Amino acid sequence: MKGSYKSRWVIVIVVVIAAIAAFWFWQGRNDSRSAAPGATKQAQQSPASGRRGMRSGPLAPVQAATAVEQAVPRYLTGLGTITAANTVTVRSRVDGQLMALHFQEGQQVKAGDLLAEIDPSQFKVALAQAQGQLAKDKATLANARRDLARYQQLAKTNLVSRQELDAQQALVSETEGTIKADEASVASAQLQLDWSRITAPVDGRVGLKQVDVGNQISSGDTTGIVVITQTHPIDLVFTLPESDIATVVQAQKAGKPLVVEAWDRTNSKKLSEGTLLSLDNQIDATTGTIKVKARFNNQDDALFPNQFVNARMLVDTEQNAVVIPTAALQMGNEGHFVWVLNSENKVSKHLVTPGIQDSQKVVIRAGISAGDRVVTDGIDRLTEGAKVEVVEAQSATTPEEKATSREYAKKGARS
C-alpha cells in the first residue's frame, strides 16, 4: 500500500511540472509573434525616412574667388648656379720662405692690398749686386769715352792710327751695351724684390689660406696662397630652353635691360635682383638649352659662388589680363575648365583657355570674364547645375587653440 501511494504522488508532481513548462513555452511564442509586426513596420519605414533625410541634407560647401583684371608679368624660369665675376688663385712669383700673411680668412680686400710677404733678404742682395755692377760699368764707360776723345785729337795729327781709333770707338759702344744690360739686371732684381710682397690682383673676398707662415713656397705651387672670388658684382649662369631664345632676343631689342631675379632653392624667397648680361653663342645639342648669364651688384652679400638658385627673367608684361587662382583651373577630357557660380550660387562648367600661370594664379585668355566667380575648393563634390554654399577658408585651429598649443609645447620643452 505504501509503495502504490508514493507512486501516485510522483506521477502528480511530474504532471504539474509538465503543465507549468507548457504554459511558459506558449506564453513566449505569443510574445515573439506580437513583436514581429512592429519590427517589420519599422524596417519598412526606415528607407523612406532615410530618403527624406537625404533630400533635406545641407548644401555642398565650396570656396570661391572672383576673376580680376590686372597686369601680369611674363617670366622665363630656369635653374642656375652663382659664379664669381672673377676667381683668382694668388700664387707667389718668386721662391722663398713665407714670412707673413696680412689677411683674415673671408675678408673683403681691394686690388693692391698686401696679402703676404716672402723673405726679401736674397732679393735685396741680388739687387745690391746688380746695382754695384752697374756702377762699375758706368765708370768703365766714362773712362773709355775720355780715351776716345784723346784718340780723336791724336788722330788729327796722325799720332795714332785709324785702327786704334776704331778700336777705342768699339770699346765705348761695347761698354754702353754692358750698361744697358746692367740696368736690366737692376730692374729684374728690383722686380724680384717687389714680388716678395704679394698683393691682391682684384677686389673680392679671400677664402681659406692654403699655406702657413714659415713654409717654403715657389712659383710652381699649384695650390697657391689663397683664392680670391670677386663677389661685387657676382654672376648667375642658368639655362633656358632653345624655344625661349627668340623671346629673349626680341625683348633685348626693345632696348631696356631685362630684369633677372634670383630665388632660393625652394623657390619661396627672393634673394636678389640683377640684369641680363649675355647669352651664350651656341645651344647645347645634348639638352636643347642655352646658357644665360646675369649680373648682380650683390652689395648685401646675399649670393655666394656655387650657390644653387632658381632664376626668373622678366621678358614682358601682359596688360588687362583676366586672372583667377590656379586652384580653380581643372583638366578634363574636353580640356581645361572652371566651375563658375551664378547669382543663385549654382555652378556650371566653363571650358577655358589658360595662359601664363604659376603656383598662385593663372591668366585665362578665353572662357570667362573679369567679375565671374569661380570655385577654388570643394570641386570634387560638384555637378552641373548644383546649388552650393560658399564658405570662407578656415584654419585648422583657432588662434586660441594655437596659443594653447604653443604654451603646451613650451611647458613640454621645459619639463
From Swiss-Prot:
Its main location: membrane. It is a peripheral membrane protein. It comes from the Bacteria. The keyword Lipid metabolism does not apply. Residues 399-415 have a biased composition (Basic and acidic residues). SUPFAM superfamilies: HlyD-like secretion proteins. Residues 1-21 form the signal peptide. Residues 32-60, 392-415 are annotated as: Disordered. Part of a tripartite efflux system composed of MdtA, MdtB and MdtC. PANTHER family: MULTIDRUG RESISTANCE PROTEIN MDTA. HAMAP family: MdtA (MF_01422). The MdtABC tripartite complex confers resistance against novobiocin and deoxycholate. This is Multidrug resistance protein MdtA. It comes from Escherichia coli O81 (strain ED1a). The lineage of its organism: Bacteria, Pseudomonadati, Pseudomonadota, Gammaproteobacteria, Enterobacterales. The gene is mdtA.
